[in-house]
């Protein structure tokens, strides 16, 4: 049985991701590496299965549950993480697949560690918390645009292993996978999937293998892009982008007004030097401009003003 759980994105997540996706909207095309399209497609069980099948190198992989935007709570019941895409296969393995385009904003290695622990929380809270043997295997995958390890591989797989004894594995059931769209070194079908995600069209010359799973994935992407639900998503992205633009414009207008008021107050005591004028007009911090405005109101001269704000 497949469960498609669609949870509305929190406003701050939409604001962060919509600004990135707005560029794609203006260009008229989304790729599978774009947050909104990735979520919309991964809701589909077949698409989710095909992506995981290629990543894991398991052509016969079968899923029994599929979720997108699932919120995982910590032990105290507080929200901890929101998983982009999560699935469970028929053997009980848990998969979390994250599209992570902006790797410079966070430490992906430590994020994977944090996610790993929290994914076990629902199992431990189910009443069998003292029986750790019930913890299912978990596979966390981060799909990135850049190579965070710098070794030019399309796929990096990490499991716990003893440093003193070669080939002695901890076998704690945890696996962390990092996929890198910038490399062509890896299994041809996986490289083709990553290149398809990066530039989502079968005409992409970087697609080395027209695997049936990629072909099927492309059909689903086409269906999603033609759906009413996707049109609603596009409109939401546009709306949030416009709201953010209006907010930025309003803030910019207020800042310009404050800067002009500061200059007018200073000019009451004499001409303002070009250096000071430029400093005031170039300032974009609203709080700092408010402080300067108060200082200008109390200052008897430009020099007095500068001494108050320095």
Regions found by a protein language model. Name each.
Residues 142-145, 180-181, 225:
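Pocket-edge structural micro-motifs
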């Amino acid at each position: 049985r497949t469960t498609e759980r669609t949870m509305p994105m929190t406003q701050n997540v939409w604001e962060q991701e919509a600004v990135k996706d707005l560029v794609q909207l203006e260009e008229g095309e989304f790729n599978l590496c774009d947050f909104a399209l990735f979520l919309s497609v991964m809701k589909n069980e077949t698409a989710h299965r095909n992506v995981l099948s290629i990543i894991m190198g398991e052509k016969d992989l079968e899923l029994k549950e599929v979720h997108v935007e699932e919120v995982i709570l910590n032990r105290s019941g507080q929200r901890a993480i929101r998983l982009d895409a999560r699935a469970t296969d028929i053997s009980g393995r848990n998969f979390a697949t994250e599209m992570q385009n902006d790797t410079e904003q966070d430490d992906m290695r430590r994020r994977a560690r944090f996610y790993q622990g929290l994914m076990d929380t629902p199992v431990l809270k189910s009443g069998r918390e003292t029986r750790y043997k019930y913890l299912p295997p978990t596979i966390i995958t981060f799909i990135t645009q850049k190579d965070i390890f710098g070794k030019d591989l399309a796929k990096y797989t990490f499991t716990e292993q003893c440093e003193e004894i070669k080939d002695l594995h901890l076998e704690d059931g945890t696996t962390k996978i990092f996929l890198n769209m910038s490399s062509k070194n890896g299994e041809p079908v996986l490289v083709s999937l990553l290149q398809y995600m990066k530039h989502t069209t079968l005409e992409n010359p970087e697609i080395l293998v027209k695997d049936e799973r990629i072909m099927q994935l492309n059909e689903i992407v086409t269906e999603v892009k033609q759906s009413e639900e996707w049109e609603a998503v596009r409109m939401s992205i546009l709306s949030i982008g416009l709201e953010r633009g209006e907010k930025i414009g309003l803030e910019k207008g207020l800042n310009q007004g404050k800067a002009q008021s500061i200059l007018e107050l200073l000019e009451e005591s004499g001409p303002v030097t070009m250096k000071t004028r430029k400093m005031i007009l170039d300032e974009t911090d609203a709080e700092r401009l408010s402080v300067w405005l108060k200082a200008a109101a109390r200052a008897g001269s430009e020099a007095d003003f500068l001494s108050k704000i320095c």
